[in-house]
Amino acid sequence: MAKPANAPKTGKTMLKVNDPIELEVVYNALTGISDAMAVAVVHTSRSSIVRLGYDFSTGILSPKGELVGQGLCQPIHMGGMPPALRAFTKYYEGRIHPGDILINNDPYEGGSHLPDIFLFKPVFAGETLISYVCAMSHHTDMGGRVPGSNACASTEIYQEGLRIPPLKL
């Protein structure tokens, strides 16, 4: 798919750091930002799953979807962030702009299962896309045929609840 003429520029994929001290400083800065995001999620959430169970995750990804920062959360969620972001870049290539919020829980488009909802926000420096930040949270019920949305006898995904394809909010 060709990029529109007004598409934002995309920053380089990897930061080249040769000095181990500089690498550690960058690593800790990215981890610190991800941790601060996690603290903000806990302090603003009304969900007991988030506030008490910590069943959520935060992270920072490169414009190409590489995980570069991970917050204090569930490490198992980190594997879902890159494919969920790649689903957005597939559908919205060249059409992601400052202020966009992207949502997805579709297991066929990078999500893990319907109760895990991913939110991504692109981060720009001027007109250049430099990263995405992600907050992902487990939800107790997605409106499936049984409370909790996880019915073992389901024969199709639509019986499990609301399936959200990669969308802009």
Predicted regions: what is each one?
Residues 126-169:
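Mobile "lid/hinge" segments at catalytic clefts and subdomain interfaces of large enzymes
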Residues 76-79, 118, 134-137:
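FAD-binding core of FAD-dependent oxidoreductases
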Residues 76-88, 140-149:
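A short, polar/charged loop-to-alpha-helix boundary motif
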Residues 39-47, 66-68, 73, 81-122:
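Conserved mixed alpha/beta core segments that line enzyme active sites in large multi-domain catalysts
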Residues 61-62, 120-124, 136:
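Core beta-strand residues in small-molecule sensory/regulatory alpha/beta domains
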Residues 2, 11-77, 82:
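Long, charge-dense accessory insertions within large macromolecular proteins
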